[in-house]
């Protein structure tokens, strides 16, 4: 009996070690001068922390946003479950914002017509020279269309990474295919044209800080933004 117990303990310990070796942990935080998302202005200077776990293509992550200068800025907590195999990726995100259908901003309130949660599914493919993503809201606090019905608000985005002068660049174009007040569109509309540059600043031999700048234009709303930010991570 004692030998069996020791064998089971040894097996569990070896399994734990193996799992720890294969599980990837992400801990980071962005500081941004302006919270711009898919061409929309969602807040002023903000802290945006990330905590995630990944295992063989499967990942679970939490992402948040809190305003640092304006108390009226909406707080946000998003949970994403995704799977990547080769260039293909699929995922589901639960967005929660403090401002929504529930005036009390309760997190654990999921009633269809009084929740601050929004659920979105996505599918995409990374071709190497460019990536393509499609997102659709399927439940929760979604927008409405011209017929005052659930819009199943969707967003399509193409991103092209490239390197120039030892700096990592990404050019992005995003569009909303259907009418929805969630994105403020009356039909197909280009809502996001952005260019981001990122460069890591070396602090010590083992620590550097990625700094990024991004210019974004929203042709639909006729707005433009310039954002500066940096990322902290172990």
Q: Language model features by range: what are they?
A:
Residues 1-24:
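Cleavable N-terminal export/targeting peptides
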Residues 19-24, 91, 161-170, 198-211:
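Short loop/turn motifs that connect adjacent beta-strands in outer-membrane beta-barrel proteins
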Residues 20-53:
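Outer-membrane beta-barrel initiation region
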Residues 23-25, 43-47, 73-77, 115-119, ...:
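Residues that define the transmembrane beta-barrel architecture of outer-membrane proteins
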Residues 28-35, 58-68, 90-98, 105-107, ...:
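Transmembrane beta-strand segments that form the barrel wall of outer-membrane beta-barrel proteins
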Residues 109-180:
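Detector for outer-membrane/organellar transmembrane beta-barrel domains
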Residues 160, 195-197, 201, 222-234:
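Outer-membrane beta-barrel "beta-signal"
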Residues 168-203:
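Outer membrane beta-barrel transmembrane domains
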């Amino acid at each position: 009996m004692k030998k069996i117990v020791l064998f089971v303990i040894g097996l569990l310990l070896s399994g734990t070690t193996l799992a720890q070796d294969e599980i990837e942990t992400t801990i980071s935080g962005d500081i941004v001068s302006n919270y711009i998302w898919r061409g929309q202005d969602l807040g002023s200077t903000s802290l945006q922390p990330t905590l995630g776990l990944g295992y063989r293509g499967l990942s679970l992550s939490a992402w948040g946003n809190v305003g640092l200068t304006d108390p009226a800025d909406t707080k946000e907590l998003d949970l994403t479950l995704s799977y990547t195999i080769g260039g293909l990726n699929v995922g589901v995100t639960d967005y929660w914002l403090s401002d929504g259908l529930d005036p009390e901003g309760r997190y654990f309130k999921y009633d269809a017509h009084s929740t601050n949660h929004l659920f979105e599914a996505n599918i995409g493919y990374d071709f190497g020279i460019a990536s393509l993503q499609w997102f659709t809201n399927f439940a929760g606090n979604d927008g409405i269309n011209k017929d005052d019905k659930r819009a199943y608000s969707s967003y399509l985005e193409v991103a092209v990474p490239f390197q120039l002068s030892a700096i990592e660049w990404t050019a992005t174009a995003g569009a909303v295919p259907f009418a929805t007040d969630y994105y403020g569109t009356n039909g197909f509309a280009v809502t996001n044209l952005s260019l981001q540059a990122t460069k890591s600043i070396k602090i010590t031999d083992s620590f550097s800080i990625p700094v990024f700048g991004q210019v974004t234009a929203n042709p639909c709303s006729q707005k433009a933004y310039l954002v500066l930010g940096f990322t902290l991570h172990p």
